[in-house]
Amino acid sequence: MTLKITRRAYAEMFGPTTGDRVRLADTDLIVEVERDYTIYGEEVKFGGGKVIRDGMGQSQRESKDCADTVITNALIIDHWGIVKADIGLKHGRIAAIGKAGNPDIQPGVTIVIGPGTEIIAGEGMIVTAGGVDTHIHFICPQQIDEALNSGVTTMIGGGTGPATGTYATTCTPGPWHLQRMLQAADAYPMNIGFLGKGNGSLPGALREQIDAGAIGLKLHEDWGSTPAAIDCCLGVADDTDTQVAIHTDTLNESGFVEATIAAFKGRTIHTYHTEGAGGGHAPDIIRVCGESNVLPSSTNPTRPFTVNTLDEHLDMLMVCHHLDASIAEDIAFAESRIRRETIAAEDILHDLGAFSMLSSDSQAMGRVGEVILRTWQTAHKMKAQRGKLAGDPNDARGGHDNFRVKRYVAKYTINPAITHGIAHEVGSIEVGKWADLVLWKPAFFGVKPSLILKGGMIASAAMGDANASIPTPQPVHYRPMFAAAGGALARSSLSFLSQSAAQAGVAERYGLAKTTAVVRGTRAVTKAQMIHNDWQPSITVDPETYQVVADGMLLTCEPAEVLPMAQRYFLF
């Protein structure tokens, strides 16, 4: 016997299905479900009088044949698709994406539910991969809570705490600091990788940092990003299969942008804040996003371009780079980095896929808890100003924005993971990867997640009063969960190491409790591997007006006066 119900009734019961559309938060972005992996009439749902009961949707099978956890009827948004499915987790990893249930009585089951299976209700929820923030100044450990509760589950960068060098540069310099920071990372429910200091013209002091556990090296102008240092650093990276990130020479002291590009010698490099307000050759560092070997990212204070963007940057610069407002040269240095024309162009270069990643620059001209939020604000602003992308349809119902959404979600998930050699572990919702997953109510998408899973276990959640009779009474705020406690923390999160450090037994020598994973495959990555974000335009910047032209097209847009995902979400 079959029962027909309306689409609305179905969506309210089991979540949206193929062809249904969902608005993301209060933006203009609409996604359409491309495929539903569940089977109509055989959906599983937990609760009184529902499906997942003994002998019904739950089988009698032992745990070895069943998922540890199933997220039911979830709307997955990832770079590879926007689909409805059940998600099975096993041993902290994603085991299957498909149809959950009891194969003894149900057809098409690919994820077995048994007595040993926990259920997370995904009906009406969106699931994304945990974010990967690759521009972290480890100034204070409290950043980790802020990042985790925003949906970021991996942090890559450098620092040693509130030291002057760390305020300005993402470097954990030298073997001693790397050892101590890796030991400190054991205490936090976050995947973490550290970058050593890459500014040196001889390889010895750089190589020893990789051997001590750094997963890459950071070149920063405050330490001297000279052509010699760039060349040496990239040579060490090639020898060790690690990545290099660079903040180039704003003052053009040791050469202009052409000299820096020449020093790259075609080798892969991750350019931080490639627009330049965060630092880099003034006024035309933005040119490098057209190079095939350059993997360009933005930091979030310029995302998106608004009426307030320019005003806040000067004070941020003075603090972060240890400048003195009484020195005219320091003021000139700061002002040279803040250009409305290149910031406006950055919006468009993101929308067209020339800028491949987005990160925070935490407490050093960026906000660690706003990577995801500002990514989607940028996507909204570009749709509002530029209309639909060529890859998105426009029909009688107004069409959808699936391609644009895939482009933007890739900027803080899979592309930074590919860039830093960790995409075999994290960065997407794919079978075999670490189960770092974020669940959102659509109305709060990109702003306030409901659950954050680390390694298949809930690490943080928006939770009500712990003394209440039910979980929902106020005050509801983010609270650490069991994956953030005791021995579970070490098994639920990763510390990333270089291959040479892993082979040398660094984890055992340092006494690390956390699960370790190695970075690999960084040196062969090119812009072409940046998913949905691989455009390589030829860019020129007018040295007088700062106007940006890409492949003959003038890139300009107005600053936003009002944004979604803003004050209405943060009244309490």
Curated annotation (Swiss-Prot):
Requisite cofactors: Ni cation
Pathway membership, UniProt: Nitrogen metabolism; urea degradation; CO(2) and NH(3) from urea (urease route): step 1/1
Residues that bind substrate: H220
Details of cofactor binding: Binds 2 nickel ions per subunit.
Catalytic residues, chain numbering: H321 (proton donor)
Ligand binding (Ni(2+) 1): H135, H137, K218, D361
EC numbers, comma separated: 3.5.1.5
Any Gene Ontology biological process: urea catabolic process
Compartment list: Cytoplasm
Catalysed transformations (reactions): urea + 2 H2O + H(+) = hydrogencarbonate + 2 NH4(+)
Gene Ontology CC: one annotated term: cytoplasm
Urease domain mapped to chain residues: 130-572
Residues that coordinate or bind Ni(2+) 2: K218, H247, H273
PTM remark: Carboxylation allows a single lysine to coordinate two nickel ions.
InterPro entries: Amidohydro-rel, Metal-dep_hydrolase_composite, Metal_Hydrolase, Urease_alpha_N_dom, Urease_alpha_subunit, Urease_AS, Urease_asu, Urease_asu_c
Family indicated by similarity: Belongs to the metallo-dependent hydrolases superfamily. Urease alpha subunit family.
PANTHER family: UREASE
Subunit structure comment from the entry: Heterotrimer of UreA (gamma), UreB (beta) and UreC (alpha) subunits. Three heterotrimers associate to form the active enzyme.
HAMAP family in the record: Urease_alpha
Stated name of the protein: Urease subunit alpha
Organism whose genome encodes this protein: Ralstonia nicotianae (strain ATCC BAA-1114 / GMI1000) (Ralstonia solanacearum)
Recorded name of the encoding gene: ureC
